[in-house]
């Protein structure tokens, strides 16, 4: 069997209301307190789904992050788990190893993500401690595209023949006329 735990985005005030005797002054301490109350059996296979900003993650620009990293939590809190499937960051990435991973979003939400290749992450959990990750590429019906050109170029219908006309575009004019 595999135990699956889910924690939403947690603020210190959320944990303080539920566990008033725990240290919950920071996001990190609040998340650690919440995990400690899950009673994880480390001899079994454990997966956690969480929506937090982990120290060391690279934000892509379209996510909301706090000034100074106040809402960061340490990746060490995931040590009792065989896999941590994380949300909050739009770009797929491993944090300390493939066992602590942001899968990224399936769609691009901002032009800061225009060059991202979106995927679905498949995590295969074998025996205790065995993990393999597979990424399946996604091909959106409509993509985000950045184009540059003069006013005359971008207003010429033929300019768009080389693109999917259904894509969402961000246009940069290279002239002032």
Q: What are these language model-derived features?
A:
Residues 1-177:
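Extended recognition/assembly regions associated with phosphoester-bond processing machinery
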